[in-house]
Amino acid sequence: MSADVSGTESGSESGPEPEPGPEPGPESRPESRPKPGPGPEPRPESGPEPGPRSGLRRGPKQGSERSQLCPEHFEPLSWFCLSERRPVCATCAGFGGRCHRHRIRRAEEHAEELRNKIVDQCERLQLQSAGISKYMAEVLQGKNQKAVVMASAARDLIIQRLSLVRSLCESEEQRLLEQVHGEEERAHQSILTQRAHWVDAVQKLDTLRTNMVDMITHLDDLQLIQREQEIFERAEEAEGILDPQDSEKLSFNEKCAWSPLLTQLWAASVLGSLSGVEEVLIDERTVSPLLHLSEDRRTLTFIAKKSKVCSDEPERFDHWPNALAATAFQTGLHAWIVNVKHSCAYKVGVASDQLPRKGSGNDCRLGHNAFSWVFSRYDQEFCFSHNGYHEPLPLLRCPAQLGMLLDLQAGELVFYEPASGTVLHIHRASFPQVLFPVFAVADQLISIVRGPLATVRLDSPPHHPCRSGHASR
């Protein structure tokens, strides 16, 4: 777009514009100065030229610039036309010249601006290269080590469980080990691919930066202007190299080691053996005043009114009908069974020793905080609850017994029905170091099954119709 030099148009490029008058220059000159003749035009007055940034050297001296003359007026190409994007002489830019009404600026100013842009781009390329190098050195290396460790842990877990049921699942063992190996190879290959990609990206960035530095140091103003399009193309190519981002494809997927068949057989093997069942007793100091504890410390019975006999100990739950076991689990594999056939409102599971005991808030309510993981029933509704999240469990019948299997090494809590051999729910998490079996009952009673009774299986378990409980969840 053209604009009259006498106006005050503002454009994206700053610089002096020509004014009407007898002088051929784009700036106003002193009245005492003569009109330009056919020879070289005197240099217009200007302030000190800005020096190059970041310590980069300027191009060749002005002697080589004067050797470039206007083909029409044979004058130095000391000005740059922003409208036609080409260098022009002072006569072309002055009054009556072909670029008289165009936006112009000094060629050296335009070249200096290009130099500054190249310097800025070089700095950005250097920072981008440093970021990619840091990503390769820290993130990719850590991902590779973590994938190897996680793959090894998953492999050991699979072999340990399959040792209990080797005769029934040899083919399953082979399949799962191949999946773990394939996932490990996939994660490792993804990391290698990422590393190769970013090494190539760094090399491209270094090459682009080197070429741009060469342009600054070896090209004069006119040559630099003539290669402006190439400069922008290289800058655009550099912008096309994105910054590295973390991805799940670089991580080992633990789900490749999960197997419903393996979990079913493993849980049945542990709960079906006498040595696999814990001797769990309830800690009478934690029993709520709404519950009555039997003499053998295995049965909890709900009572409508709070007992006045219970002392107010710090370990006791004073509002919700809860109780903790006296047995603490810190490592290894643990299993226990609870008889729940008489109750339509109960919760069973595990809880951390950090579970609060006093008050009516959710911080003391099982399944509504981060310190408890429970299987709960209310009337005909079943769910798994943790930290306020309740996952419904569609059961076809009310279980008479509930088996719990806690594997602290694998971070798994399995709720299991011993009578049918059915896994009701599996929860995987990073559990705290100390866990206790936890119980809550708001209807009738529940009781912990003794160890020797854990091997009992009912060929046709009796159906217990679900009764509506009267206590709140």
From Swiss-Prot:
Map out region (Disordered) in residue numbers: 1-69
Give the ZnF (B box-type) ranges: 65-113
Q: A single Pfam family, by name?
A: PRY
Q: Where in the cell is it found?
A: Cytoplasm; Membrane
This entry's comment on induction and repression of expression is: Down-regulated by vitamin D.
Q: Which UniProt keywords apply?
A: Calcium, Calcium transport, Cytoplasm, Ion transport, Membrane, Metal-binding, Transport, Vitamin D, Zinc, Zinc-finger
Q: Name one GO biological process term.
A: calcium ion transport
Q: Which residues form the B30.2/SPRY domain?
A: 259-455
User: What SUPFAM superfamilies does this protein's entry cite?
Assistant: B-box zinc-binding domain, Concanavalin A-like lectins/glucanases
What InterPro entries does the record point to?
A: B30.2/SPRY, B30.2/SPRY_sf, Butyrophylin_SPRY, ConA-like_dom_sf, PRY, SPRY_dom, TRIM/RBCC
Q: In which tissues is it expressed?
A: According to PubMed:10978534, testis-specific. According to PubMed:16371431, broadly expressed.
Q: Name one GO cellular component term.
A: cytoplasm
Q: Does the keyword Calcium apply?
A: yes
Quote one Gene Ontology molecular function term.
vitamin D binding
Please note every region of biased composition (Pro residues). 35-51
Q: Which residues form the signal peptide?
A: none
Annotated membrane topology: Peripheral membrane protein
Q: Indicate the quaternary assembly.
A: Interacts with YWHAZ/14-3-3 protein zeta. Interacts with TRPV5 and TRPV6.
UniProt function note: May regulate epithelial calcium transport by inhibiting TRPV5 activity.
What's the name of the protein? B box and SPRY domain-containing protein
Its ancestry begins with: Eukaryota, Metazoa, Chordata, Craniata, Vertebrata
Which gene is this protein's source?
Bspry
